[in-house]
Amino acid sequence: MFVFASFLGFIALILVVQLVRLAIIVPSRQGGERLALAKVQRGSILDRQGRIMAITTRLQRVSVWTPSVTSPEETVRQLAGTLGMPADSVLNILSSHDGYAVVKQRITPEESAALEKLRTDGKLSGVKIEDYYGRFYPQGHLASHVVGYLGADGVALDGIERTYNDALAPPPVSTDTDPAFGDQVVLTIDLDIQYITDMIARDAMQAQKPDSLAILVMDARTGEILAYSALPDFDPNEFQQDSPRIDPDALKNRPVTEAYEPGSVFKIFSLSSLLDLSVITPLDRFNASDVYEKKFSSREVIRIHDLAPYGVITPQQIIEFSSNVGAAYASDRTDNESFFNMLSLFGFGKPTGIPLQGETSGLFKPVSQWSARSKATIAMGQEVAVSAVQMLAAATVLANGGILLRPHLVRKIVSPNGIVIKELNREPLRQVVSSGTARTMLSWMETATLPAGTANRAAIDGVRISAKTGTAQEASRKTGTYSAENFVASVMGIFPTDDPRYIVYVAIQNPRGLQYYGGQIAAPIFRSVALRIVDQVGIPRAGTKTAIPSSEQEAPPPALPAAIGDTMVDLTGVPKKLLLPLLLRKDLNVTIHGAGFVVRQTPAPGAKIEPGSTIDLELR
């Protein structure tokens, strides 16, 4: 796959060489305007290794001077067959023009050769093959939402093409013979990693059939975005046609323009805030055996549930098991203002400044607009809306010792003669939490990749992974209620834990498969991407899974079995991954049959449990 991207880059390099040659020696068949077209060129867009993602080069199109057509039916038939167009479309083009008509832009060399032969044989009177200069995107769909596109008229319409139009566009020329070239824009994108994420994203789109899917990869040390896969996407070459065949939905750049409730992934930021405020410690305990419930004088009642009773748990286990109840109880330790101020430092409620159009600020309401339930629900990732890029940027805090970095898509701007005009380096914005808090959260996230953790499918043997999954119900803007069918499944992964180099964020909007939890479908996608990166860049892998240091924990915290005391609890609906700690109980004989969720159990809820008791669980 890496050879594929490099090969495309090599082909594009040949085009550059050809372009320079053409700009010098192309003769003018139509006077000075033709010469100016050859000498005034828009700058190229390159990936971080210098591989071409956008370039202005010589192209060909088919035109017809309709008064010279002697056999209309034969001309339509030959053009349609050679160009792969419906005959009706060709006929419509010719019949709607009294004189000059362009039938197709950007024809291939094969189409050009076939048409030239037909012209030589006298079968296409009035048909011409014309050279012109246009924008070519040799990588096609890859990172198309980043690169953007020009319209057929050469106007920059989206992406880096539009944001950096002043740099890419050549300066005005005073005469037809003055050469003018635009600057080159070098992106942070790595086409090798981009190809990996695109391939994995397309497989996931086919399997899960979601409305959209995003995989973003960032260099954790610099804030540079290495891959930006946002599906559905498009081929920017289509816009060089007079009538581009583009699904409008594919043009939506969702990672920057759309905001959604992040769900449980947000707990890594809410608990980091509480930890840094010193209102919780790693040794605290929260009772997640039952529902979190609060009644207020306003008669408002809050009830927050977990998938299963987790017993008395630590803050680390709130992350490991993704306990909503635990997160809600932890949020009770602070006031609204302090909680809001800490989370605001992560960048929520504000645009990141990424150089793409239409960036959303998300939604993080001021405290004056909070209800009695807001603090508890925000702690678990509801009542706050974020973009995928905001989540990626916020994660830099955990990967950089508590410092927030600005996300980058552009590395540098280079003049036509190779001089670096501007270089965009690592940009620290502010210290959000202490380095100790950041390290602690990474260690808590690492426990989520253990067998009982919600991110266990993100684990890679021999590589320390910190990850947190999320599953958020979509909120209806009309009714204010949560959908029972539409979800956003996501995962945030940072690795290696002890020396973060990469941040990967995956968000899947409204998956339509049998599974929809972030731990079920987003975590495996992260693992696939991370595995390829580990192999690609040569991250060392230990022979066995590295043990998690627990210097912050003086005593091992209780796991799920703590929820089972003298009486049997109701485990109906509990997923298998949350049952695994029961197998470690030496005082119980636990048997698990099947996979999925508990549908039947023996003994029944409420039965007395004694040492040596047998517990039989059937899953489907």
Where are these predicted regions, by residue range?
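Periplasmic/cell-envelope proteins involved in peptidoglycan metabolism and beta-lactam response
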Residues: 1-241, 259, 337-350, 358, ...
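Beta-lactam-recognizing serine transpeptidase/beta-lactamase-like catalytic domain environment
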Residues: 54, 220-264, 269-508
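Conserved SxxK-family serine transpeptidase/carboxypeptidase catalytic domain
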Residues: 101-122, 128-141, 145, 149, ...
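Flexible hinge/switch segments at interdomain interfaces of large molecular machines
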Residues: 167-178, 363-368, 553-556
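Bateman (tandem CBS) regulatory domains
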Residues: 177-183, 248-255, 564
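BRCT (BRCA1 C-terminal) domain core and associated BRCT-interaction motifs
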Residues: 590-611
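Conserved "repeat-terminator" motif of extracellular CCP/Sushi domains
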Residues: 609-620
